[in-house]
Amino acid sequence: MTVRPGHHRCREEVHGTLVQRGDLAGREYASYLVSEQLGWGVIPRTLLRDGPFGPGMVQRWVDTPDRHADDTGGLDLVDICAPDAVPEGWFEILRATDMDGEPVALIHADDPRLQRMAVLDVLINNADRKGGHALEGLDGSVYGVDHGICLHTENKLRTVLWGWAGTEVPGALVVDIDELISSLEGDFGTRLGEHITSDEVAALYERAVDLLAAPVMPRPNGHRPIPWPAF
């Protein structure tokens, strides 16, 4: 279980629980609701709860395989390796140097489960998709965690998942985005407004409409496109 407390902003009662619209916990929960509304299941089950330090959120813990155990050479879906050791079919996002001054490459797999997460990040305007926030569960699903600074009205997309930049969004995901737009025009938009501001709900709607009209993944804009640290 992961626990994240709320922080002050627009305190109000929602379904019997005191939450703060627009706080970290509210954004975590709203991001989870968007993932569920799309039917993608990217974000582990997330609930709002009152805890010993006040209102916040709890999230199902995700156990992951240790692909680096015993020096077997396995790679996580997002990882680093020597520049000359990038596996065939993987995306190289950037090159850097490690603490010993040796060159390394930041890479991620060309995996449809990870691609779905990247599309979700565009929709919820994720400003902090680090490599360590993409978890391959023991159940075979890929989960995203840490969405407390998503859903801002301004473009703040910052991610390590740039491998699909400039490519078309898969058709099945486009259908889901279309259905999300319809739901935002109705009760789901109202429900989200209990946890984020009305301007943020409107911005989510516009991002979805824009992506539906031109279903192509964005490219880095040159202004801090990678979170730091990257993991």
Feature roles, as predicted:
Residues 1-2, 17, 52, 70-72, ...:
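Intrinsic structural disorder
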Residues 52-123, 163-167, 171, 175-202:
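ATP-dependent phospho-/nucleotidyl transfer catalytic cores
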Residues 2, 17, 43-46, 64, ...:
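Residue-identity detector for threonine
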Residues 37-40, 94-157, 204:
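Conserved kinase catalytic-core segment
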Residues 34-38, 62, 132, 164, ...:
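Generic structural signal for bulky hydrophobic/aromatic residues embedded
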Residues 7-8, 15, 68, 108, ...:
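Histidine (H) residue identity feature
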Residues 21, 137-231:
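C-terminal catalytic region of ATP-dependent kinase domains
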Residues 1-88, 119-127, 138-143:
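Conserved ATP-binding subdomain of kinase catalytic cores across diverse folds
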